[in-house]
């Protein structure tokens, strides 16, 4: 049975490559215009958090403290502009804002010069040859920003939204899941009541079983109508995890439990899966489609958490989704408190997939400014754009006003 699953996964991976190549070939009409990228600008930007955001590995955002993003502006010789962006969360993954800027300016952006916007397969190949993947993938956050700019350009030059470059959307709107930062039980209960339009929350837990159970009780009493997606962000040790898992059946509104153990400990995740009353999801331990395939062979999890930055871009993230589905793994969508450009890239991608829960894209929840114009959102529901490219505009003057000074 496992052999068949592996073969099917490999076949689907090959199909994913073929589909992507086919789109590049089909873009010849716009390509014949001769529009080639002549300039790539890298812009580090700070955007303040409204409130603190604490997860299992520590604080990833503080009130009034700028979160650090990197925007990419790619301009063609006929004046078309494509935007890309990525977040940086070095206590979640290793790419600092300085590393992303340096990688883009010195290694990746030069690879884009002289290319058309439709050569993203060539771009990905050259990026992986320049910054070689090690075990999983290499410098994925930086690569993601540049690929999004290519896709935005390709969409604008063909008059198509990004979701159509991926085969078209399955959903016209996307309901969002918001996050509940680790805090005292009463404060976490107040947070879920603060967003009445949101019906699904990713509840962050700390690795302290007794405190986490008290938090869950408080949240469940405050909003018995919600669905809970648990996320430990690698914070649990084996003995505490066993106690926590044993107590979880008390809560009937939990749908899954994400990354309870360290990202490197796949066998520990498999052991936790055997004892968990709810499906287990892998996130920090699964960056690439190769990771998905290995995890499926180990039977280490039930669900895969997709993130555009950790995958190295939209098309690599889509490839991970294909491999996961081919191996019988459910799909969850998430982000890293993405600001507007990378947030919208995820919206386009997730509109083409059948996710098991609303994607956890919490930028509108935590950030004081999404740094885009034209996003349509009511309550916790985003309309998937049908305008070309990302379907939004970037307020460039505001972006430059919030430029970070590095070094």
Question: Language-model features: where?
Answer:
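Conserved, mostly hydrophobic/aromatic
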Residues: 79, 146, 159, 231, ...
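Structured beta-strand/loop patches that form or line metal/cofactor-binding pockets in enzymes
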Residues: 31-92, 364, 368
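Metal- or metallocofactor-binding catalytic centers and their adjacent structured scaffolds
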Residues: 34, 39-43, 75-157
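Active-site mouth loops of central-metabolism enzymes
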Residues: 173-185, 206, 281
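N-terminal export signals
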Residues: 1-2, 6-29
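Alpha/beta enzyme core
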Residues: 189-198, 244-251
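Catalytic core of soluble alpha/beta enzymes
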Residues: 203-342, 371
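Flexible C-terminal active-site loop/helix
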Residues: 10, 35-49, 64, 337-407
């Amino acid at each position: 049975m496992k052999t068949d699953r592996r073969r099917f996964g490999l076949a689907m991976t090959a199909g994913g490559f073929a589909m992507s190549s086919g789109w590049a070939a089909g873009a010849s009409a716009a390509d014949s215009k001769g529009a080639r990228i002549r300039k790539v600008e890298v812009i580090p930007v700070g955007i303040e958090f409204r409130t603190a955001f604490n997860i299992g590995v520590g604080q990833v955002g503080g009130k009034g403290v700028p979160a650090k993003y990197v925007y990419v502006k790619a301009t063609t010789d006929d004046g078309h502009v494509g935007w890309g962006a990525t977040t940086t969360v070095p206590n979640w993954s290793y790419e600092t804002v300085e590393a992303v800027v340096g990688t883009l300016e010195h290694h990746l952006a030069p690879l884009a010069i002289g290319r058309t916007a439709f050569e993203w397969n060539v771009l990905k190949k050259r990026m992986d040859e320049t910054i070689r993947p090690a075990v999983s993938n290499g410098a994925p956050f930086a690569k993601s920003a540049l690929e999004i700019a290519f896709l935005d350009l390709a969409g604008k030059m063909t008059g198509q939204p990004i979701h159509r470059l991926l085969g078209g959307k399955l959903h016209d709107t996307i309901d969002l899941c918001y996050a509940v930062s680790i805090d005292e039980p009463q404060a976490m209960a107040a947070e879920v009541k603060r967003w009445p339009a949101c019906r699904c929350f990713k509840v962050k837990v700390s690795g302290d079983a007794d405190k986490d159970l008290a938090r869950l009780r408080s949240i469940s009493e405050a909003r018995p109508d919600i669905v809970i997606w648990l996320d430990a962000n690698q914070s649990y040790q084996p003995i505490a995890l066993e106690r926590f898992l044993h107590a979880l059946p008390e809560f009937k509104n939990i749908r899954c439990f994400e990354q309870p153990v360290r990202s490197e400990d796949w066998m520990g995740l498999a052991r936790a899966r055997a004892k968990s009353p709810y499906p287990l999801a892998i996130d920090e331990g699964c960056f690439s489609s190769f990771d998905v395939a290995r995890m499926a062979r180990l039977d280490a999890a039930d669900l895969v958490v997709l993130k555009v930055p950790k995958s190295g871009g939209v098309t690599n993230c889509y490839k991970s989704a294909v491999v996961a589905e081919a191996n019988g793994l459910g799909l969850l969508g998430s982000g890293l408190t993405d600001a507007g450009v990378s947030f919208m890239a995820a919206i386009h991608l997730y509109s083409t997939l059948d996710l098991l829960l609303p994607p956890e894209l919490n930028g509108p929840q935590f950030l004081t400014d999404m740094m885009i114009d034209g996003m349509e959102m009511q309550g916790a529901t985003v309309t998937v754009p049908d305008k070309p490219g990302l379907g939004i505009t970037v307020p460039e003057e505001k972006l430059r006003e919030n430029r970070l000074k590095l070094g």
